[in-house]
């Protein structure tokens, strides 16, 4: 055998349980786990079901708090920019409006520093307005949304006034200027030889 290969001759009617693990388990317990998972798995009949299932897989539960998983294993869960970009699609348009506020509230609680003070994702806090507009467009009561999130929105906008953030501020003409020595400040955050592209 070659490392990484598993070969088994089977005939019609055979049933095999294969598990690769660092701990030994009985085949019966593995089969029970598989059958329990298979029973809970959604019934997928087409592309729309598959998209909804994939969207559901990106919403995770961390210590009882729902968050959006950004990039599966290679990025953290609950990242500011990634959550604000994807929250409407993964909740509102996927038929899960009840998750929108819970995920957004968790994001606000976890990302206060980056929302109101400093971040290398200088445009990300402003995406909060887009997310809330999407929420209202999907049927949320504008007055309730304003009552709940107006303080957050005002703090975000005020943080862009001169002196509010080290890396970005509003200029006299109303435009935003972002600059910090040797630091990438937008979604284009690639570096070459230690210098942002």
Task: Show where each model-derived region lies.
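Generic structural signal for well-ordered, non-membrane alpha-helices
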Residues: 18-19, 105, 109, 130
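The feature captures the catalytic groove of carbohydrate-active enzymes
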Residues: 1-4, 9-17, 114-151, 158-197
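Alpha-helical support elements that line or immediately flank enzyme active sites
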Residues: 74-110
């Amino acid at each position: 055998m070659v490392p990484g290969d598993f070969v088994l001759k089977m005939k019609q009617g055979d049933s095999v349980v294969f598990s690769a693990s660092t701990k030994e388990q009985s085949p019966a317990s593995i089969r029970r786990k598989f059958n329990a998972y298979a029973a809970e798995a959604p019934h997928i009949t087409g592309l729309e079901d598959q998209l909804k299932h994939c969207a559901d897989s990106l919403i995770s539960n961390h210590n009882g708090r729902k968050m959006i998983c950004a990039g599966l294993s290679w990025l953290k869960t609950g990242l500011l920019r990634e959550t604000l970009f994807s929250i409407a699609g993964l909740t509102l348009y996927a038929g899960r409006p009840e998750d929108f506020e819970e995920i957004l509230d968790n994001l606000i609680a976890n990302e206060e520093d980056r929302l109101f003070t400093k971040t290398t994702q200088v445009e990300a806090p402003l995406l909060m307005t887009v997310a809330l507009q999407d929420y209202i467009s999907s049927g949320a009561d504008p007055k309730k949304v304003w009552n709940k999130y107006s303080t957050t929105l005002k703090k975000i906008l005020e943080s862009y006034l001169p002196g509010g953030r080290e890396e970005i501020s509003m200029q006299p003409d109303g435009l935003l200027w972002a600059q910090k020595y040797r630091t990438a400040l937008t979604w284009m955050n690639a570096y070459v030889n230690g210098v942002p592209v």
